[in-house]
Design a protein with these regions (language model features):
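Short beta-strand-centered aromatic/proline hotspots
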Residues: 135-142
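Residue-level "contact hotspot" at macromolecular interaction interfaces
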Residues: 118, 130-133
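Acidic-enriched and Gly/Ser
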Residues: 1-124, 141, 152-176
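Active-site-proximal flexible loops/turns
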Residues: 14, 136, 148
Length: 176
């Protein structure tokens, strides 16, 4: 399996997927658009929002040379900007980039939910389960009031931060 990243119009990712599927129903390439669920409080009411984990990026899962046959169909679809690294140098994801993308595609599923965490005796965050598991080293800041953890993600040469929600649980007595 090879995974590729494409850049599309930000906040137009779902529209691009619908349009591409309508124009090319015979395409067997899987298109992934990972999202995250975070609580947002507006005017005293907390609601769950689902923004993108990687705004403006979609990920393609291919087997063999199938991407080459659909290369121009992706480029001609409205909202498409470019393949990564570039349109002339299309390379599959590898190394740390692939690990980060697979964490959100395979481990957490299409929607990264709320992580269950607790704080140790040194006030450091410890993830019990959820999408933050495995990303503890990437946590930059923890906002206890908003119940969000800001993490740093790298994709190709670009580095950006996103917020993931967490739920505080009590540490069991037998755990370390």
């Amino acid at each position: 399996m090879n995974y590729y990243a494409i850049q599309v119009k930000t906040r137009g990712e779902e529209k691009f997927i619908r349009l591409f599927r309508a124009l090319h129903p015979d395409c067997s390439i899987a298109i992934f658009f990972p999202k995250r669920s975070i609580p947002v409080r507006r005017k005293g009411v907390t609601v769950q929002t689902t923004p993108a984990v990687f705004p403006g990026y979609l990920f393609l899962e291919t087997e063999g040379e199938t991407l080459q046959s659909f290369h121009w169909q992706f480029r001609k679809t409205c909202g498409f900007y470019r393949f990564l690294k570039s349109n002339r140098n299309i390379q599959p994801l590898s190394g740390r980039d692939l690990e980060t993308v697979l964490h959100f595609i395979k481990k957490t599923g299409p929607l990264a939910g709320i992580s269950k965490v607790y704080f140790d005796e040194n006030s450091r965050i410890v993830v019990a389960e959820g999408p933050l598991a495995g990303l503890e080293g990437n946590i930059i800041k923890v906002d206890k009031r908003k119940k969000r953890a800001k993490i740093k993600l790298d994709l190709y040469d670009d580095s950006f931060t996103i917020d993931l929600g967490y739920e505080l649980i009590e540490k069991a007595v037998g755990l370390h």
